C-alpha cells in the first residue's frame, strides 16, 4: 500500500507545531495509521465524503493528525493550515465545533467522544444509515467513568455498528498500568487486537467485520511513531524546532520508502 498519505500527514503535523508552537506531536503521530485506514476504508466504498460526519476523535489532543488528513482531503486549505493555533483561527489545539467546516463534534475533555459516538450511532441505525460510526479513544480515557458507562450501554445496544479504535500508545502507563484494564475489555466486549501502525491489518479487520455488531479494536501503537526519539514522555507536549522538524522529516521519508 502506498505510504505517501501517512508521510504527508506527519510532515503537516510537524509544520503546524513549528508554526503554532502548540500541539501534541507524538500523540498525533500514534493515530496517523488508524485515521488513514478509516479514510481508505470509506474511500474504497465510495463513501469518503462521509468521513467527517461519521468520525469522532475522542482524544482531542491528537487533532493535528486529523487536520493533516482533512487537508489532504481538501477540507482544509493550505492557508488555513498555516494559521493553526493562531489568534482568530478556528483550527485550535483540540477538536473544534464548526459544522460548516466539517467539524461536527468538539472534544478535549477526556472521555466525552465515546458516549457522543454511541448516541449518534444509535440514532443513525434507527434512521437506516448503514455507515459505521468510527471513534478513536486514547488509552488514558479508560480512567474516565463516562467511558465505562458507555461501554455498558454498548452491551445494551450491541448493533449500532460502532467501530471503537483504542490508541494504546502506553501513554497512560506512566501513571496507571492499563494491561489488566484491557484484559477486562476483551472479556466483556467483542474486541480485536492489531498493530496500530499496520494499515493492512486495520483495513482487514474493518473489511472482515462488516456487520452491525459493535466492535472494539485495540490498536497497539507507539507515541511519535516512527521517530524513536519521540517515544518517551518528554515529547508528550514538546515542540520541535524547525531544524528538528527537518531532521524528523528525513527520518520519516527514510522509514516509509
Model-identified regions with their sequence ranges:
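Generic beta-sheet signal
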Residues: 53-55, 131-135, 162, 211-221
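Glycine-rich beta-alpha junction loops
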Residues: 33, 61-62, 168-170, 198, ...
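N-terminal hydrophobic or amphipathic helices/low-complexity stretches enriched
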Residues: 1-9
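Cofactor-binding active-site loop characterized by glycine-rich and histidine/acidic residues
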Residues: 13-19, 23, 28-157
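A short alpha/beta connector and helix-capping loop motif
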Residues: 144-169, 214-220
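Conserved thiamine diphosphate
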Residues: 129-130, 176-205, 253-256
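Short acidic, glycine/serine/threonine-rich loops at helix termini
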Residues: 67-69, 96, 146-148, 174-178, ...
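Glycine/aspartate-rich loop-and-adjacent alpha/beta segment that forms the canonical ThDP
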Residues: 199, 203-257
Amino acid at each position: 500500500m502506498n505510504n505517501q498519505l501517512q508521510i504527508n500527514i506527519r510532515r503537516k503535523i510537524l509544520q503546524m507545531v513549528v508554526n503554532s508552537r502548540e500541539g501534541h506531536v507524538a500523540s498525533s503521530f500514534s493515530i496517523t495509521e488508524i485515521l488513514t485506514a478509516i479514510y481508505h476504508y470509506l474511500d474504497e466504498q465510495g463513501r469518503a465524503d462521509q468521513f467527517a460526519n461519521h468520525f469522532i476523535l475522542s482524544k482531542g489532543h491528537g487533532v493535528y493528525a486529523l487536520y493533516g488528513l482533512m487537508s489532504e482531503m481538501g477540507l482544509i486549505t493550505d492557508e488555513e493550515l498555516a494559521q493553526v493555533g493562531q489568534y482568530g483561527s478556528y483550527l485550535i489545539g483540540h477538536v473544534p465545533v464548526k459544522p460548516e467546516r466539517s467539524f461536527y463534534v468538539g472534544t478535549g475533555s477526556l472521555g466525552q467522544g465515546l458516549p457522543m459516538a454511541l448516541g449518534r450511532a444509535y440514532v443513525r441505525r434507527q434512521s437506516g444509515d448503514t455507515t459505521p460510526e468510527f471513534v478513536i479513544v486514547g488509552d488514558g480515557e479508560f480512567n474516565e467513568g463516562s467511558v465505562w458507562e458507555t461501554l455498558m450501554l454498548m452491551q445494551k445496544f450491541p448493533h449500532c455498528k460502532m467501530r471503537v479504535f483504542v490508541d494504546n500508545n502506553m501513554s497512560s502507563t506512566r501513571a496507571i498500568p492499563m494491561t489488566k484494564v484491557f484484559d477486562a475489555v476483551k472479556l466483556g466486549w467483542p474486541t480485536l487486537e492489531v498493530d496500530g501502525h499496520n494499515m493492512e491489518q486495520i483495513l482487514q479487520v474493518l473489511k472482515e467485520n462488516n456487520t452491525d455488531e459493535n466492535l472494539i479494536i485495540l490498536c497497539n501503537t507507539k507515541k511519535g511513531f516512527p521517530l524513536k526519539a519521540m517515544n518517551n514522555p518528554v515529547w508528550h507536549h514538546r515542540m520541535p524546532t524547525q531544524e528538528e522538524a527537518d531532521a524528523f522529516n528525513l527520518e520519516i521519508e527514510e522509514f516509509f520508502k
